[in-house]
């Protein structure tokens, strides 16, 4: 067992150890995949724990995979890496559609495809691979997902039937709309002025 000093070396070796799982099902993981620890394109605003970019997205024409620095457990990192390698196998062509699902199920992923994770048999293999790789040389980031609190949206309500519609700010200058049932002007509800 090699003691890896950086997470990228660990991740690249993990790809090599995961390739036979794909090869056994006749799927080829590209030899030149690049794997790094980093946030998905949505940054910390989302709960994405991995992302694969297609070859056409990079100037060196290689799939680039990012594993979230919020992950620290080696088996969870490998689980996420398998999911992203499925994307690399089909060069991100099918997102989480039928072709992705076919590949994912064949290598042992389960559950809804957008968040497909290792089934029991695959998880057992991942535990062995994690043991072979040794500790994941990474300090897990404690990321807090802060929800943006938005102001309540202006609305209009019919005085007769209570029918309510949200209003877009650009239409507020025209005044409240008419109730589609009663044909009367609706009352303003919420913040109609900035």
Residue ranges and their predicted role:
Residues 1-73, 92-194:
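Metalloprotease/metallohydrolase-associated module, dominated by Zn2+-dependent proteases
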């Amino acid at each position: 067992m090699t003691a890896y000093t950086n997470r990228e070396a660990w991740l690249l070796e993990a790809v090599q150890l995961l390739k036979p799982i794909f090869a056994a099902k006749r799927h080829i993981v590209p030899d030149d995949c690049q794997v790094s620890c980093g946030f998905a394109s949505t940054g910390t605003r989302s709960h994405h724990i991995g992302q694969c970019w297609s070859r056409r997205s990079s100037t060196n024409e290689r799939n680039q995979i990012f594993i979230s620095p919020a992950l620290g457990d080696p088996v969870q990192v490998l689980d996420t890496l398998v999911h992203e390698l499925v994307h690399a196998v089909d060069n991100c062509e099918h997102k989480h559609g039928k072709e992705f699902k076919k590949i994912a199920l064949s290598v042992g992923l389960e559950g809804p495809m957008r968040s497909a994770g290792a089934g029991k048999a695959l998880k057992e293999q991942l535990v062995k691979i994690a043991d072979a790789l040794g500790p994941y040389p990474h300090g897990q980031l404690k990321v807090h997902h802060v929800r943006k609190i938005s102001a309540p949206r202006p609305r209009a309500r019919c005085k007769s039937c209570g029918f309510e519609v949200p209003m877009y700010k650009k239409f507020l200058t025209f005044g409240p709309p008419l109730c589609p049932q009663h044909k009367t002007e609706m009352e303003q509800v919420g913040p109609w002025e900035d």
